[in-house]
Each structure stands twice: as structure tokens, then as C-alpha cells.
Amino acid sequence: MLWSSRKLDEQPHSTSVSSMRSFWGLMFAYWRSDRWQEAWGLAAIIVVLTALSAMASVWFAEASGELVSAIAFLHHPENPTTLKTILSSAASLATIVVVREVGFTAFRHLFSTTLHRKWRAWLDRRFNDALLDSNHTHFHLQQGAAEAVPTKVAVPDNIDQRIQESIKGMTGGAIGLAIGVAGVALSLFFVGGKIIETSTEVSGLEFLGSYGSACLTVAAVVAYVPISTLLAAKLGEIQQRLDVRMQSAEGSYRRDLATLLHRSFHVAAAKGEGAQRGLHRRRYLDVDHTWANLNILTAIYMGFELVYNFFGSRLVAYAPGLLPYVENRISLQAYITGAELANAIINDCSWFIHVMPDIARLRANATRITDLAKAIEDAQQPREFYARTGHSELRYDQQDPQFGLTIQQLELMHPGDDEPFVTAGNLHVKCGEWTLLVGDSGSGKSSLLKAINGLWPHGRGAIVMPRNVRTLYAAQDIHLPPVSLKALICLSDAIEAHSEAEAAAALSRAGLADFVSDLAMEGRDNQSWDQLLSGGQKQRLVLARILLLRPGLLFLDEPTSALDGEATVAFHQAIRDHCRGATVISVMHDATPPKSASGEEFYDSVLVIADGAVTKTPLANLTTRPVGPARVKPRP
């Protein structure tokens, strides 16, 4: 069952993503998990390499000062430098650059991408576990109306894009930003210490003593960086909104393309390329409009950042040391070294400005992920979840298997409606009974089967299932996932639960002996089984699954619609022979129900839907199929 009313009210619900419904909960979930040693171990290595990179920035500034000073004094009349000294300084600078970029930065990138890969994999497993749980959360999220989830985005759109792209972008962005924060802190420590160490007095600021030039550097940074940071934050807010819109538009367009590829035959058969082309144009128009706005903002931000970098590195960085240099308190080498250190401080403090687009994307990705986590948690109580869009008072219970299946005062409704479109009083299907479910097309036969199996959200009444009896629901539309043929037969069991011989025997009994050698294959000729098999072959595959799993309670929704009369009889006879004692409820549109080769009836009774009411009669009373109201009501 999808949900049981008694158990839902008694047990608290918690999913594998419960802690990820807030920004910081999402950020820290991995670091507090059972993989914390892996996470913190990689993080520690990254911090150490970041510290070494910060120290290398100090070495770089000192080496740059030595090289510029050596070049400046090459033609000094009293104490000229030699070419050997210049080459030695250049070699030292080159060595520092190689060690910093290759030994520190490149290896840090390797460890950070490894952390990115492992963090993403952990989150991917958690969200897949939450969506593909026994509560069928993925189904509820797809069925829920837009107003069913009280979040800003309601039922999350493009769940695939959120799990694939948003998680990847969020984890990568978070790691990059964390490295940036660590780099700023460590660089301020090492570079700031060097600035204080090389500080000197400045005229007019004698009361600061030897810390005069250091204070000037701090003042220049404090005056320059915050104003620019505020402007960057405003632009970042706009970019975050555009990023969210862009992800939604891209996800919708990709979803329609994927749907086309899965249904290309139906589009071709209906000559629906024009309609599909129009849909794609509308989807891409949304992408293009959002992209244009994003490009304008990116260009504005790029111009702002380039101007900011130039003034910071060429004017602000060199200004604090200019006064003591003019007063001849420091040498040219000390002046250049101080300017490079000031430039490093400005770059570090400007980290927020440089990564503002990344922060905007991080927040956009995190918002889409946390909204999905909220929706997953919200759908853990399906009755309350669906009650926001209509009556959701269906109750599910269990009873002794010998009493079979019982339906009590059942009413099925559409979202937002108060009147039922299908009603049933007290109905009982005995253990081992075969019951035919008939009614006009659209009268609610499939909806009734869905409701019995917990897949219809709105209505009232009680459904009592036999306890500890395996059920199998064969839906009307058969869509096969891209897995091996054996896995398709074994669903919902694990593939290891049944031997190759058992699976091969089930295939043969179902009339698919030609495919026995392909049990381990996921298709043929670059086509999946869903693309390769015909409608009749898919129904035979469902029969093979039934024969392998041997359920005690079987629900069939037009199971032989693609089979001829002889194959239909063989289908029913195989179930009768190999699933002895099973209870069967089957939807069929045939004018007369099938009989065995000896003329015996397969079915014992009939559930008839007429004028929206379900009644049960013996099979002998079946005359013609009744006419009922359409299941999908026309809008007024």
C-alpha cells in the first residue's frame, strides 16, 4: 500500500533528505554523515595546500621586489647589479611560481574535485533513496497539484534537472567558495603579517610609529573594497533570480526533448512534428529571453570587475607605500614588495566580488535542492499532502488472507471536486476468485484499480487487503526501464532473487522463448527493450513476470489488448496453471470474456461500472458492456 491511515498518524516520518530542507542543513549534511571522515580528511588536505599557496604569495611578493630592484639598479653608478643577480632573481621567481601553481594549486584542484565527486555522489544517493522509497514519493510529487506543497515553487518542476545539474553545481560551487574563504583567512594571516613586519613610519602619522605604512594600507583597503562589494551584492541578487529562471527554462526544454525521443514513433505516426516543433519553439523562447537578460547582466558585471581590478592593482595597491618611498624611508625593492603585498590583500578582500556570480549560482542551485527536499518530506504523509487539493479520506487496512479483498463505501473524486465520479458500496472479492471489471471507456475502471492499489489520491471509503499476500498490478500502459531483460522480468524483486533458469522458464511459458539468450542484455541493435518490443510482446513480458513472481493477488488493466484471441486464452491459461489460488481482478473491453480451450470460464464474477456506480454480479448475468460517464470531466 502507498499509505495506511492508521500507521501514518502514529509514526513520525523522516526521509534521507529531512535535514536538507534549509540552506545550512543542506551544506552540512554530508559533513555530519557517516562519511564525515572522508569529507573532513579531504578538506584538511585542501586547507593545508591552501595555506602553502598563501605562503607562496608572500614568497612571490618578495621575489618580485628583488627582481624589480635588481633591474632598477642594473646601471647604478655606485652599486650596479649584475646580470647574474637578475637571472638568479628571475629563476627564484619562476621556481616559486612553478611550486605554487603546480605543487600547491594543481594538487589542491585534484583533491577538491575528488571531494566534489564524492559529495555529489552522496547527495545523489540520498535523493534517489528518498524519491524511490516504499512510499512512492516520486509518484506523489508528479501527481500533486501545484498548490499541494506550501513552498515558493510549489510542486518542484524538472526533478531530474535538480538532482543532476543543481546538485553538481551546488557542491562544486560550495567547495570553491569554501576554498576561497580559507584562502582569504590564511592569506590575510601570512600576507598581513608580512605587511606589518615591513611597515615603516609615515610623515604626519608619527603617532602610529613604525605601523604607519601598514595602517595606510589597511585604510586604503577599507575605503576601496566595501563600496564595491555592496554594488557587487546588488548585482548578485539580480543574477540569482535570473539563474533560477534559466535553470527552470532549460530543464523544461530538455524534458520536452527527452519526451520526444521516447515517443518519436507516436509523433511520427500522428504526423505531429509541427505541434512538437511549436512546443520546442515556445520552450526555447523562454530560454533565449532569460539568457539575453543574463548576458546583459554578465557584461555589466564583467566591466565593473575589470575596472575594479585595474584600480585595485595599479593605483590603490601602490598608493600606501608611495609616501614613505618619496620620503626615502624605504628602498625601491621594499616599495615594490609592499605594493605586491597590498595587491594580494586587496585581491583577498575582494574575493566576495570576484565570486559573486558563483555565490548567486550556489544560492540558486541550493534553493532548487532545498525546495525538492521540502516537497519530498511533505509527501511522506500522502493523505495530508493530497487533502490540500481535494478530499483525501481513503483508508487502507489488512485482514486475514482467507477473507480476500473488501471494499467499503468507496467514492473516487477528482481534485477540487466534492461529487464522486465512481461509487461502490460494500463489495467483496473472495480468495481465489477471478473477477472481471467492465464498463464503458472512461467510466473509471483504471481509476478503481489505481485506488485499490493506493495510486488514486482523492476520495473516501475503505479498502481492506489480504495480509501478507503478494500483489502485482499490471498497468494499462507498459513502459520498460532501460535495464536487462532479466531485471524486467524480476521486477519488483532484485535480479539476484531468481536464477537464470527460472527467468528463462518464465519467458518460455509466456511465449518469448526467442529472447531467452538475451536475459543479460539491455536491448538489441542500440535499442532498449521498451523501443524494441511490440505491444503484444510487452504484454507477454508482463505475463512472464507474473509467472515468475506468482502473486497471490493480481490486478490486470487490459492485459491482452494487443494479443489475438488465441494468445489471450493462452495468457489466462498460463496464469490459471502457474498461479493456482490467486485472486484476479482484470479490466477488459472484449464483448465476451475469454474461455479456456475446453470451454470453461476463466472468470467467476463481474464488477460493472454503470452510471458511476460499481456493482458485482455473477458472470452469467453479464450481457453487454454498460455505458458510464467519462472519467475525465469536461471543463465548464
Q: Language-model segments: which ranges?
A:
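A hydrophobic transmembrane-helix motif
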Residues: V48, A61, F104-T105, I179-S210, ...
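ABC ATPase nucleotide-binding domain helical subdomain, centered on the C-loop/LSGGQ "ABC signature"
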Residues: R470, K486-S528, H572-Q573
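An intracellular "coupling" helix at the cytosolic face of ABC transporter transmembrane type-1 domains
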Residues: G169, L242-H262, A268-V316, D358-R361, ...
